């Protein structure tokens, strides 16, 4: 069965073809990054219009890449939510119209479920069950995943998502949009412990997270540096040091919470998905992750246990059609009536989990 996947939740237009027997056949992506850069952020109306312009050419590009035709498509999957309303409608309208024309089922997909399952597109796939860290510009959540459609929310950010905190901190430092990736790049040149920022909620007993206070700590440090220098500009090395300290704090919190989730569930496999999953520091830290089962005071310590960690291929960390095509393929037979164009800009993942 050949499934066409369509992603249009924000500022990337993704189209892909996934074959249930042969795997991913084609993957095409257009990013609107340059278009939104001059505005310093995503402009929803512009995003929607650009999706409309890109969907047909990207679909035809995927078909050519796979050596297939419209008649070979067996189902159409699309991102129903969450995301920008207009952007979602662009993808939904196209998906439903195409499915209607082809007389094929249409499969609505939750955007976060697409990210959650994206590591299964890699050659080396994780086995169920596993702890999943969904970390992006819009969401930071820790899930227990026991199988396709069997997800339990363990914890999440109570305010800013980690990726959002990266972007907002980058803006505080005067970095160009989108700043999160640039911040990570500059952090590579930062000196260890030149600045030390708090790790919010790192010692809380639950798996909740918070990053807004960390952003405030960066602002305080930036204002202090500017006051000391008597200028708005921040010295290059100081800026790099702040970037490193911020990134270290975020990664430390994420790692600590995931370790707690592993101890809570008893799982020893971790999957990291979402845009921040491409972060080099995060990959390095999680790649060396171990857990140690706590022991009563005075008792011999348990040996540390190595954790198996899986990341999606870098190309599938950002929003993409491949993850939607794959998730749709996993839900074949559950398509809703063709012609139902509703989208869900706000759609908690808890509504599809058991």
Swiss-Prot record:
Lineage, top ranks: Bacteria, Pseudomonadati, Pseudomonadota, Betaproteobacteria, Neisseriales
Cofactor(s) the protein needs: Fe(2+)
Name listed for the protein in its UniProt record: tRNA N6-adenosine threonylcarbamoyltransferase
EC number: 2.3.1.234
Annotated cofactor note: Binds 1 Fe(2+) ion per subunit.
GO biological process, one term: tRNA threonylcarbamoyladenosine modification
Positions that bind substrate: 134-138, 167, 180, 279
Subcellular location: Cytoplasm
Example GO molecular function: iron ion binding
GO CC field: cytoplasm
Catalysed reactions listed for this entry: L-threonylcarbamoyladenylate + adenosine(37) in tRNA = N(6)-L-threonylcarbamoyladenosine(37) in tRNA + AMP + H(+)
Keywords annotated in UniProt: Acyltransferase, Cytoplasm, Iron, Metal-binding, Transferase, tRNA processing
Gene3D superfamilies in the record: 3.30.420.40
Its biological purpose: Required for the formation of a threonylcarbamoyl group on adenosine at position 37 (t(6)A37) in tRNAs that read codons beginning with adenine. Is involved in the transfer of the threonylcarbamoyl moiety of threonylcarbamoyl-AMP (TC-AMP) to the N6 group of A37, together with TsaE and TsaB. TsaD likely plays a direct catalytic role in this reaction.
């Amino acid at each position: 069965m050949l499934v066409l996947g369509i992603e249009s939740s924000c500022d990337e237009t993704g189209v892909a073809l996934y074959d249930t027997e042969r795997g991913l056949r084609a993957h095409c992506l257009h990013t609107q990054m340059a278009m939104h850069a001059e505005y310093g952020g995503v402009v929803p109306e512009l995003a929607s219009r650009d999706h409309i312009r890109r969907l047909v050419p990207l679909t035809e590009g995927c078909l050519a890449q796979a050596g297939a035709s419209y008649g070979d498509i067996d189902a159409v999957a699309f991102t129903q939510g969450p995301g920008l309303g207009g952007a979602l409608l662009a993808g939904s309208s196209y998906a439903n119209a195409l499915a209607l024309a082809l007389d094929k089922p249409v499969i609505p997909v939750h955007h976060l479920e697409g990210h959650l399952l994206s590591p299964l597109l890699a050659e080396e796939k994780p086995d169920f069950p596993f702890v999943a860290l969904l970390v992006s510009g819009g969401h930071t959540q820790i899930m227990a995943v026991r199988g396709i459609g069997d997800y339990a929310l363990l914890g999440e950010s109570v305010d800013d998502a980690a990726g959002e905190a990266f972007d907002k901190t980058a803006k505080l430092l005067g970095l160009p949009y989108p700043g999160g990736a640039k911040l990570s790049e500059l952090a590579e040149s930062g000196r260890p412990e030149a600045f030390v920022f708090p790790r919010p909620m790192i010692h809380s007993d639950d798996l909740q997270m918070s990053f807004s206070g960390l952003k405030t700590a960066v602002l305080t440090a930036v204002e202090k540096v500017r006051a000391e220098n008597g200028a708005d500009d921040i010295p290059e090395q100081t800026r790099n040091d702040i970037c490193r300290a911020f990134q270290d704090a975020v990664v430390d919190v994420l790692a600590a919470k995931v370790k707690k989730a592993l101890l809570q569930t008893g799982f020893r496999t971790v999957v990291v998905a979402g845009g921040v999953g491409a972060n080099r520091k995060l990959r390095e830290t999680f790649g060396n992750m171990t857990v140690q089962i706590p022991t009563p005071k005075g008792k011999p310590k348990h040996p540390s246990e190595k954790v198996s960690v899986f990341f999606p291929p870098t190309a599938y960390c950002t929003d993409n059609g491949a993850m939607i095509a794959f998730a749709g393929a996993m839900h074949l037979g559950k398509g809703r009536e063709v012609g139902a164009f509703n989208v869900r800009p706000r759609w908690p993942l808890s509504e599809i989990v058991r």
